[in-house]
Amino acid sequence: MANNIKTKITRFGYIVNKNLIDDETIKEIKSDLTVVPFKINNYAPKYIKNEGFPLYVENGNYIGIPKYYGFDKLGEPDIDKVSNYEYPVQDMTYTGTLRPHQQMVSDKIIKGMEEGGGGVLVMGCGSGKTNVAIYIACKFKLRTLFVVHKTFLRDQVIDRIKSNTNVKKVGIIQRKIVNYKHPFVVSMVQSLAKINYNDEIFKDFGMIIIDEVHHMGARNFSTVYQKISSKYMLGISAEYTRTDGMYKIINWYMGPILHLEEQKPNEMVIVKQFYYSTSNKERIKMKYINGDTNKPNRSKMITNLFYIKRRNRFILYLIQELFDMGKNILFLSGRLKQIDLLYELLNNDEFTHGNVGKYIGGMKESSLKKSAMKQIILGSYDMASEGLDIEGLNVVILGTPKTSIKQSVGRILRKEVYEEHPIVIDIVDVDNDTFKKQSKSRNNYFQKQKYNIQKYYISESLKQKYELWNDKEYIKKVLVEIPEIPDKQTQDMIKTNPNPKKKYQGPINIDELNFLEDD
């Protein structure tokens, strides 16, 4: 940097010559950019602060800071090497078709990026964010780095690029694989954060797209911004906040939110809540961390649910009846043992054998694709939290308690027109105060989205106003109950399914199976 140049933008951010900026301003910059995340303590009245970390990098007389923070604090730079660089034009044509609303959003984002160079697109689950981002990249015709944080998302993005553009060879940057001389390159954020690749690899990328960009506020991922930047930066996500208060990191590096639309309310969705009471009081009771009654041990309590035999049987009854109804089912759990158990029981049964697949971390992409074709998919919350795109799903079962379920429910909301009501099965474990509290959070979301909530009460023993857990006729009856369609607009969202329902050939005789413990 020449001695008389105070500021400039490079691929490493907004660079400031400290010798030409007053000490007080430098002090303010360092203070602003030493960020301290908040950690929510669910059982105390205040937030608990974690240790802070810097977003600036010092190198002798120079300090590198986030680009958009630099714009706000110091104004336009003296030199912008990133914008003035002559990026090679790529042969990139979008061959797919955007829906009218997606086209409107794309045009808005393109205009915003032409004016400011970057920003964030926030749209709900199933709205087509990935296709919109690919379309935008093709419009700019610059080599594009698409950053993801999960392997199955990497493969999903590659498939989308190949099926919706003329680009049939997509590069990959991951671990030791560095294949970057293609119009589109997909990279894992973990590799970018941990490995110091040769800087020359990134110089011709005119656009960087970061999927599920809300994760980039995390300390370990935010270091990626200090290594790479480009003329155009686009973040896409269904989220626009972080509970630790670190979303500002994303805006400082990526730019402002250019378009925001939350998940649209959908009166077609039916939530069937089963308020479940168990007789296994030892397994359902509250557990605490180190005996501190202010810190419930949620992890231990969720694990204990797996060992309640009748609760597992009840879930099996639900799955078999939904299968009988011809539903395409996504069962989600926070415990792999529960997934393994259900997979074994269902896949070893002559009637559901071959119709069950797992969808969990560590599986090969070929196995995930095979599982995605099954009528019953048993998956982890982690795999379904973001980006999971399986066509035809119309039922999601929340097998273990969870507070934030927007992404999980979004897996069955990927259509504009529905052949039938999407169904959420929500099991509320009424004998545990922590689980009941989580249920209230889910209810707030369901009500906000105008879902139709139907409540049923199930018990493992005779109890007033409760039905018995193994009353299969009752389960069958309540699963087919649907609310009245409230208005013509909602009626227009549903059309008659001409295909007859698949007939389930017989029940799983789980009463003869001796698995897990009982009370």
UniProtKB/Swiss-Prot annotation:
ATP binds at M123, G124, C125, G126, S127, G128, K129, T130. Keywords: ATP-binding, Helicase, Hydrolase, Nucleotide-binding. Its EC number is 3.6.4.13. It holds the Pfam family ResIII. InterPro entries: ATP-dep_DNA_Helicase, Helicase/UvrB_N, Helicase_ATP-bd, P-loop_NTPase. The keyword Transmembrane does not apply. This is Putative ATP-dependent RNA helicase L396. It comes from Acanthamoeba polyphaga mimivirus.
